């Protein structure tokens, strides 16, 4: 029996990875991608399904925040053989998804927080904490061998059973909704930043912060040997 805590940034592929991981967890999961702190920090658990294992997904939460508030937020839940996972996505694709989301919902205002969170997650990656298992979403999406490595590292029996699923949580993809449910690999998720051509996205790309994010991502691509996923 193993329990999982997964950290990710909203629109960062967290639900896709959850749908892929959960079928590989022998004995099923107790919470799925179901624990959320919607700004109120009310410690509310929303259970989806039953099982021997616990899978808790945190979105838009810094790892340092969790470390400081762990006992309060977990609210007495006991975790065994804990696997901590952090999901990191190409920042330009991530921002493009948020910009696209804002086009559909003009009152949406989370872009600046997303940028700050990405830098924090990247710093955790650079620190190479052995207790954190990183999943690079873009590499995960395209590379079956990488997915097999992740499963092996987490002690799971590899399966791509959930790979093609697009769930209607967060209304699916910012671009495609749930249109590709059953064929998720057909979505063009690796080139989202090329698909948004408006003032907000173009200004971001040329900004100092945008260029800094690009440089850090490209450095990560060198380390992960995924040069084909560099931002050019």
Which sequence ranges carry the predicted segments?
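General helical structural elements
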Residues: 14-15, 42, 93, 151, ...
């Amino acid at each position: 029996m193993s329990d999982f805590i997964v950290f990710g940034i909203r629109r960062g592929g967290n639900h896709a990875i959850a749908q892929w991981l959960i079928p590989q967890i022998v004995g099923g999961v107790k919470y799925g991608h179901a624990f959320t702190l919607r700004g109120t920090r009310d410690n509310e658990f929303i259970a989806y399904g039953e099982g021997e294992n616990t899978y808790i997904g945190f979105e838009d939460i810094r790892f340092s925040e969790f470390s400081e508030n762990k006992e309060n937020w977990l609210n007495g839940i006991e975790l065994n053989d804990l696997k901590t996972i952090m999901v990191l996505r190409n920042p330009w694709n991530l921002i493009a998804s948020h910009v696209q989301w804002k086009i559909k919902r003009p009152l949406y205002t989370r872009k600046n927080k997303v940028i700050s969170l990405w830098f924090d997650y990247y710093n955790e990656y650079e620190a190479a904490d052995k207790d954190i298992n990183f999943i690079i979403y873009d590499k995960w999406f395209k590379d079956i061998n990488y997915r097999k490595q992740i499963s092996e590292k987490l002690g799971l029996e590899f399966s791509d059973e959930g790979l093609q699923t697009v769930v209607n949580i967060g209304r699916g993809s910012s671009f495609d909704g749930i249109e590709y449910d059953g064929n998720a690999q057909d979505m063009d998720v690796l080139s989202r930043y090329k698909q948004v051509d408006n003032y907000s996205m173009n200004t971001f790309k040329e900004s100092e912060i945008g260029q800094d994010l690009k440089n850090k991502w490209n450095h990560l691509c060198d380390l992960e040997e995924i040069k084909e996923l560099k931002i050019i």
